[in-house]
Amino acid sequence: MAGAAVHARGLRKAYGQRVAVDGIDLEVRRGECFGFLGPNGAGKTTTMRMLACLSSRDAGELAVLGMDPDSQPRELKARLGVVPQEINLDLELTVLENMLVYARYFGMRRDDARARALELLRFVDLHERADDTVMKLSGGMQRRLQIARALINEPEMILLDEPTTGLDPQARRLVWERLRDLRAGGTSVVITTHYMDEAERLCDRLVVIDHGVVICQGQPAALVRDRVGAEVLEMRAAPDQAAVLAAAASPRNLVEGDVVMAFGDSAHDMRVRADAAGIAWDLVAERRATLEDLFIVLTGHSLRESSAGGD
């Protein structure tokens, strides 16, 4: 697609015998927030490393901002902002010093770098902590400083790997707010996440990835509506009757021991069909369908169950 922020076809990366990314196709449009949703070990971080010129691909096509990360890393890095999952700040330097040191990598004049740094610290609500050492900041503040630092070169696109992992709810919301501000200003934003609420709140479009393969992509709400339905009915029944109850309630279902999850457009209709099956059951929950349910329908297991291991 002409003018895409990211264009990938058949993208593949392996580490020895382990295939981390297995021939994925994707397009990221300029100015959108695009997400990679999946469990730990799905291939999200490996894909981001290829986009960020930190790891070469084994096969396939990849263009980021119209450039090949493998053959044009210097030019591309000048136009990218990258926020890794781990905190990689200089803890003994002040907040402002961290910004100024990073600006040197882009050849910025000191006066320009200082002005830009102070502007960004205000953007992430850290201007009053400019002279504090980083070790005095909370985890959420350190994450916001990482975002500010990644913006020092006024990038066209920013890549964030699990940007809110380990943060408390208030800190997560502050990060989300700043990412929405960036998107509103025209910056392309690409994130990886295993948090369903984060993907639903931030992403214009996303891919669901598992075991290095893209299993679906599109707008979050549309994916849930088309693949899952509007509502979920969770029931409990005798283990030897749970499968029969599930099939009666909806053709889209999951059985885990004595717990049945039925997916469809109407929880009321699913309850009627469950009652008609003549099997005793208890209601566990009746709720709106989410991206977690989408993942369950597509893979047969939850994101939480899949989250052991690295990426």
Language model segments and positions:
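Catalytic Walker B motif of ABC-type/P-loop ATPase nucleotide-binding domains
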Residues: 158-161
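Conserved catalytic motifs of ABC-family nucleotide-binding domains
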Residues: 154
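Conserved ABC ATPase signature
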Residues: 133-137
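Conserved ABC ATPase "signature" region
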Residues: 100, 104, 111-129
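ABC transporter nucleotide-binding domain
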Residues: 176-265
